[in-house]
Design a protein with these regions (language model features):
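N-terminal secretory signal peptides and thylakoid transit peptides that target proteins
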Residues: 2-23
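C-terminal motif of bacterial Sec signal peptides marking the signal peptidase cleavage site
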Residues: 26-27
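Alpha-helical substrate-recognition element adjacent to the catalytic core
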Residues: 35-211
Length: 211
C-alpha cells in the first residue's frame, strides 16, 4: 500500500507560504518498517499508549464488532516533521535550501551583497530569516525554481544521499522515528491507507519518501 502526500493546511505558516508546491496528492512507495508478528510495535515501551494502538486496530479491523470499519474507509493521517522524522534544529527542507544557495553561489556573485543570501553565505541563518516570509520566499524561489520536476527530484535525491544532519552526522533520511514507522506498517498490514500531511513541498518529499 502506498503513502500519499498532502500539503499541510495548518501551522508552519512561513514554510507553507514559501514551499507548498502544487498538487493535492502524490503517491509514494511504502516506508520501511517490517515487524515481527508477535509484537507489531517492538520499539514502543510497554504501557497504555502502545496497548491503546493495538486495541484500536483490533477493534476497527474485527468484522462484526461494534467498532468495525470497512477496509475502504480505513484512513490514517500523519504529520511528517517532528512526527515521522526529526525537525530540529530546523526543517530539513530548509537545510536543503541552504546547501543549494551555497552550490549556486558561484553563478550569482551578486548574492554576496544581497540579503538574505549574503547572510546565508556567511552562515548567519538568523540574520537571513530576519526578513520573515519575504526572505524565506526568496530563498525557496532561488533554490527550488527554474528546473523540471525530474531535474528537481534528481537534485533532491543526490542531496539526500550525501547531506548529513549537523548534530548526529547521519543522513537526513536516517533521521526517522522507528516507532512511527512501525505504526505505519502495522496500520497498512491491517488494511489502512496512510497519508502524510506536511508543510514541506510535495516534490521535495517525493524524492526520498520511498526510502
Amino acid at each position: 500500500m502506498s503513502i500519499k502526500l498532502l500539503p499541510s493546511l495548518i501551522s508552519r505558516r512561513r514554510w507553507l507560504a514559501a514551499a507548498a508546491l502544487s498538487g493535492l496528492l502524490a503517491a509514494c512507495a511504502p516506508m520501511p518498517g517490517a515487524m515481527p508478528s508477535s509484537d507489531p510495535l517492538p520499539s514502543w515501551n510497554e504501557g497504555a499508549n502502545k496497548q491503546r494502538i493495538i486495541d484500536f486496530v483490533h477493534a476497527v479491523s474485527s468484522e462484526g464488532g461494534k467498532d468495525y470499519v470497512a477496509p475502504e474507509e480505513r484512513i490514517a493521517v500523519f504529520d511528517n516533521d517532528g512526527t515521522l522524522w526529526a525537525e530540529q534544529p530546523m526543517y530539513f527542507q530548509f537545510f536543503f535550501a541552504l546547501d543549494r544557495v551555497k552550490a549556486l553561489a558561484a553563478q550569482h556573485p551578486e548574492w554576496r551583497n544581497k540579503e538574505p543570501f549574503a547572510s546565508l553565505l556567511k552562515g548567519d541563518v538568523k540574520a537571513a530569516l530576519a526578513g520573515g516570509e519575504r526572505a524565506m520566499l526568496e530563498i525557496v524561489m532561488a533554490t527550488h525554481a527554474g528546473m523540471t520536476t525530474d531535474e528537481f527530484a534528481q537534485i533532491v535525491g543526490d542531496w539526500a544521499a550525501t547531506a548529513r544532519h549537523p548534530t548526529t552526522k547521519r543522513r537526513f533520511t536516517e533521521m526517522v522515528y522507528q516507532p512511527m514507522l512501525e505504526v505505519l506498517s502495522y496500520l497498512r498490514a491491517n488494511g489502512f491507507k496512510t497519508f502524510i500531511v506536511s508543510g514541506g513541498g510535495i516534490e521535495f518529499m517525493r524524492a526520498w519518501a520511498d526510502q
